[in-house]
Amino acid sequence: MGKRAPSLKCLKMNLLFSNDKQGQLPNSWYAATVNQHKRYKTLQTRIRTDVCIIGGGFTGLSAALHLATAGVKVVLLDAHRPGWGASGRNGGQVANGQRVEQGRLEKEYGELAARSLWQIGQDAKELVGSLVSKYSINCDFKPGIVHACFSEAEVKEELKNTANLQKNYGHSDIHSLDKTQIQNIIGSKSYIGGSIDWRSAHLHPLNFALGLADSASELGVEIFENSLVDKIAYGNKNIIHTKHGQVEANYTIIACNGYLGNLNKEISKKVMPINNFIAATEVLNDSLKKSILMKDIAVADSKFVVNYFRLSRDNRLLFGGGESYGYKFPKNLEATVRKPMLRIFPQLKSVKFDYTWGGTLAITMGRMPYLSRLNNSTYSASGYSGSGVAMATMAGKILCEDILGENGRFKTMSSIITPNFPGRGALRSPLLALAMTWYKMRDELGF
């Protein structure tokens, strides 16, 4: 008998299909300003390759590009299309270092390991910039991210972190900001201090992702879109099954992040999908624009549910805020994002949103990426916890290095202990929502 297609009910309980139509980009400012790019066919047959990559986000695209550069035959499968997921929907911040602050890494892993992790984080940001330059990707790549704090305790902690990076890691491009300095950059009384990091950067993430895809394709990578992987038969050579085709591969890279679903239970124990939301305002006049941001930088603040924002090239505010923890996005995305935005910028009360969209990322318990070799022929990288532009791009290169026998950085990243999330199956999301609600309540109360 032939293999049955997934039922409509099953598809609706899959984050790949819960909030979006097959193969269509979301109603985002990024999609509205996307560069001309290639489209790819659906897998319709059985093929063989050296490496099969599942997922066309930053991890998968970077791995494909670096493997192809080394002469490796690569097939990349995406359930929708390259750049469709979190890689094409996020805040576009290319953060410096790891998601976790260096002081905590030093305590948890020791100074030597912390330095190795710091260097990988540095290399990640540099990698993004080098790929943009090497492949002439037009994606508005610009320097500067501000970390903005609400409380004196947070400012004190940020001063400590900044001093540590300056003194012990030679980071001369990060500077502390006092209340006057930060309010001369950000037009909000909410923030009373923080730091600015000129080694960090921001970009148009969808155009970056599609630039990677086009470059990989030109180097010989076979990319297939609308090719949902529903099964992996593991062995000396894995067989990756889609509805209409199969791929036989010496190696497989699972690069699905928040859209993993039930494809691999070992990975799903380590990472949890959460939904995040962004809005793009109407075009702002010069006066209103300057009342928000006086520099062309990106901002991420100290809330547990982070607010992040920057100006677009056509003078809109791109503001991210709000999270959810189930399969479906909130019905009113505009209200979800407008609430935190007006707390920061009450002067935008009358400003309209032209675009609102959501996406799904993946977090780990420790907020560090989860890189693993699941068996001799299968790799995984996911759980970037909000720092995926740089680290997912780097993870793809690191997986490539290990496949080619250069395992130093993979050994460092895969040695990070990633605990399982509590609960099993249907209990996991409610438990996460309960924990996250506690932290959101702390945000509301100002802790």
Residue ranges and their predicted role:
Residues 4-51, 69:
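Extreme N-terminal leader/targeting segments of oxidoreductases
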Residues 11-33, 100-106, 129-144, 149-211:
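Flavin (FAD/FMN) cofactor-binding and adjacent substrate-gating region
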Residues 47-76:
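N-terminal Rossmann-like FAD-binding beta1-loop-alpha1 element of flavoenzymes
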Residues 66, 82-140, 156-168, 290, ...:
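Conserved FAD-binding subdomain of flavin-dependent enzymes
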Residues 72-74, 174, 351:
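Hydrophobic anchor at the start of a short beta-strand
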Residues 126, 134-142, 229-230, 246-286, ...:
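Active-site substrate-recognition segment that forms the wall
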Residues 163-164, 189-250:
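Helical element adjacent to the flavin cofactor pocket in flavoenzyme catalytic cores
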Residues 327-329, 334-444:
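C-terminal catalytic lobe of FAD-dependent flavoproteins
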